[in-house]
UniProtKB/Swiss-Prot annotation:
Domain LRRCT, residue spans: 123-161
Entries under Pfam families matching the protein: LRR_9
Family from the record: Belongs to the ANP32 family.
Residue ranges of the region described as Disordered: 149-258
Localization per Swiss-Prot or TrEMBL: Cytoplasm; Nucleus
Source organism per UniProt: Rattus norvegicus (Rat)
Protein name: Acidic leucine-rich nuclear phosphoprotein 32 family member E
Reported function: Histone chaperone that specifically mediates the genome-wide removal of histone H2A.Z/H2AZ1 from the nucleosome: removes H2A.Z/H2AZ1 from its normal sites of deposition, especially from enhancer and insulator regions. Not involved in deposition of H2A.Z/H2AZ1 in the nucleosome. May stabilize the evicted H2A.Z/H2AZ1-H2B dimer, thus shifting the equilibrium towards dissociation and the off-chromatin state. Inhibits activity of protein phosphatase 2A (PP2A). Does not inhibit protein phosphatase 1. May play a role in cerebellar development and synaptogenesis.
Length: 258
């Protein structure tokens, strides 16, 4: 199957700009060049073109979001400078099983500043003396060559890398939870409780002052009542006394007439 037909089959009624991963392994490149792949695949992050008889990268479109590129088991012998121009954000590049023979060909990868992992397994260049030391010295940005770092530690799988990233995020969340709220942060519930207590104290003060005023008013009313009662008693006492004086005066007058 030709590459152009393979691409149409892999789209599965999707628009090219919706595709983030595209696997075109084992199809056929006419004249050893890329066909059917263009700039509309702008969201592409993973592209695999293994064993497609690819010999030239000249027709590779601009794929600024591409992170991983699989080009193993082809007949590429040079022209790697195109990768830095068209895929500047590559972190993983697999050129295993190609026709790469010398360090000058690989030197073009120096401009891939984000490149961390490079595979050249089964390329003639691996037969050079001090091959690994030379590649690490030439491409100082990479961490892994043919699956191992400079201390021969094996590179983690892609799935493990994703799990590690998720784990790091979880640890960060836990650390934030343990650290508590940031400085200057105040809990709304605490603010409400404080406001409620202040209101409650204010209400108690108002209630006490109101009760005190009522007691004072009651005492004043009682005093007024006592004064009024004493005046009434005095009037009652003066009333009979006055009448008695009047009668006594009348009796004295009658005696004088006699």
């Amino acid at each position: 199957m030709e590459m152009k037909k393979k691409i149409n089959m892999e789209l599965k009624n999707r628009a090219p700009e919706e595709v983030t991963e595209l696997v075109l392994d084992n199809c056929l490149c006419v004249n050893g060049e890329i066909e059917g792949l263009n700039d509309t695949f702008k969201e592409l992050e993973f592209l695999s073109m293994a064993n497609v008889e690819l010999s030239s990268l000249a027709r590779l479109p601009s794929l600024n979001k591409l992170r991983k590129l699989e080009l193993s088991d082809n007949i590429i012998s040079g022209g790697l400078e195109v990768l830095a121009e068209k895929c500047p954000n590559l972190t993983y590049l697999n050129l295993s099983g190609n026709k790469i023979k010398d360090l000058s060909t690989v030197e073009a990868l120096q401009n891939l500043k984000n490149l961390k992992s490079l595979d050249l397994f089964n390329c003639e260049i691996t037969n050079l003396e001090d091959y690994r030391e030379s590649i690490f010295e030439l491409l100082q940005q990479i961490t892994y060559l043919d699956g191992f770092d400079q201390e021969d530690n094996e590179a983690p799988d892609s799935e493990e890398e994703e799990e590690d990233e998720d784990g790091d995020e979880d640890e960060e969340d836990e650390e934030e939870d343990e650290a508590g709220p940031p400085e200057g942060y105040e809990d709304e519930d605490e603010d409400e409780d404080e406001a409620g207590s202040e209101v409650g104290e204010g209400e108690e003060e108002v209630g006490l002052s109101y009760l005190m005023k009522e007691e004072i008013q009651d005492e004043e009313d009682d005093d007024d009542y006592v004064d009024e009662g004493e005046e009434e008693e005095e009037e009652e006492e003066e009333g009979p006394r006055g009448e008695k004086r009047k009668r006594d005066a009348e009796d004295d007058g009658e005696e004088d007439d006699d």
